[in-house]
Amino acid sequence: SFDASTGGSVSGNGLNIVFQGGIVDASGNEYTGTVQVAAKYIDPLSADFFDYMPGNLIGADASGRKYLESYGMAAIELTDGSGNELQPADGKTAEVSFPLSGALLAGAQATIPLWHFNEAKGYWVLEGSASLEGGVYKANVSHFSFWNCDIPTDYVIINGQITEGGTPLS
């Protein structure tokens, strides 16, 4: 947790978030109390990665739909003491540091596209980028939900039929 007016930092599970002061409630009103933070780093190399991830790894950028290759994801939620949702005020951001394991770090690009999950649309939306600094991807975000560092790739749909001795299997 941190004080809404002064900001602060929260760390855990390799994830680090530095908050500026300036938090608002769902109506856009200034919030001045203690901000509760629920945050989880979701490691794309973990066996339970898909259990925590919303939707699938399909995103949209200006050129259309893309398949996303994740280099790290974070679920972040801010609430007041009663569980009401909070967000940074307009013009305020928080710096999120996504840890990279050795296998991911070896193939990490200096800058990677940053995506957030749009719950209304049901897919990932490109919103900025993250920079590689000291073995972590760092990004400034202006709202909280699921954030994902991803390399977008084109995808194809392959249709086929499995047969045995010329007879289709069901």
Model region roles, listed by residue range:
Residues S1-G12, S27, D43-S46, D61-S170:
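Proteolytic cleavage junctions
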Residues G14-A62:
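Predominantly extracellular/luminal regions of secreted and cell-surface proteins
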